[in-house]
């Protein structure tokens, strides 16, 4: 059985599976709705400023390039290391898991193929764990 018959992660296949920029934008909008709504995310929501527009835009732009689409983040802001960009935050297991829960709920709300939903969440676990590892408080 081939686990990735849709070739996610190859060229722009993940970007297309996510619905390109419009689909990524919907995902990120829903992600922050989840962060504002679920009790498990209160702590990580407080890490963000009151105005979510700047971080929303950055996440949309980052995911565009990360998923194989246009590299909007680097065009607008330059290069990025996700772990180093989040190093100042205290991200332990609880915060990592809350972030992943928000993303899982947002992904589940998207019209993606089930195989892409599983793939995307598995891929997002990698940078989430790296952020925890370099955090000011990785416990």
Model regions and ranges:
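Core of compact, soluble alpha-helical bundle domains
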Residues: 1-139
